[in-house]
C-alpha cells in the first residue's frame, strides 16, 4: 500500500502546490496551476481511511469524529512540512494537503514595514499565492530588528519563525488556547507587543485582531482578496461594527496592505 511519505515526496519533487487524496480516485496534485494524477493506483475506501487517520493523534481523531474535519501541520525529515485538511467526503475521509515550501526572506521594499509598532498589517492575495510565507517572513523581520514580544494565534501553526532579538510565543487554537477570543483575553497578561493571527477569515478572528489594535498592538494577518480595498472590505464585513462606519474605521486602523 502507498505510504504518505512516498506520496508527499513525489508530489514535492514534481513541484506541486497541493495534494488531493480521495477514495476511488488516484492521488492527485496541483502542479503549475493544474490538477494532475500522480503515478499511483486508486485509493480504496479502506486505504484512504487508514493512511489519513493514521496521521492524527488521539485529540485530532476525536475532533474529526465530532466535526468531520480537522486541520494539522505535519513534518517528515528530509521531505518537508505539510498543512493537512482532512474532511469527510461521502462518508469516507479525504484530504487536501498544502505543501509548505521553505519561506524566503522579506523583499527589500517591504522591510520598512517591520518598523510598524501599532495597527493592522494585512497580507492579501488569492489562495496559494504565498500569503502565509510572506506573513512569517515579516514577523521574522520584526523580531530580528527589535526587542519585542510577538504572540501568534494560528490554526494550525504553519511556517517556522526565528525569534531573533525578540520573544516569540506560538499558540495553536485548540491546542495552546481554546479560541481566538481566549487567546486575546490572555494577551495583556502576556505583555505582548504584537500578535500574528494567521487567517482573518472568520468573525471571531477578525474581532480578535481589531481588539488587539485597539489595545495598541501591531497585528499581522492574511486575507483572501485580490487587492487592498477588497481586503479591508472583507475585514469590515466580519468586524461586527455598525455598517455605515465599518470600512472607514478599518481603514483608519490599517497601516499597510501587502
For the regions a language model picked out, list residue spans one by one.
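Short, flexible helix-loop junctions that flank or precede catalytic/ligand sites
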Residues: 1-258
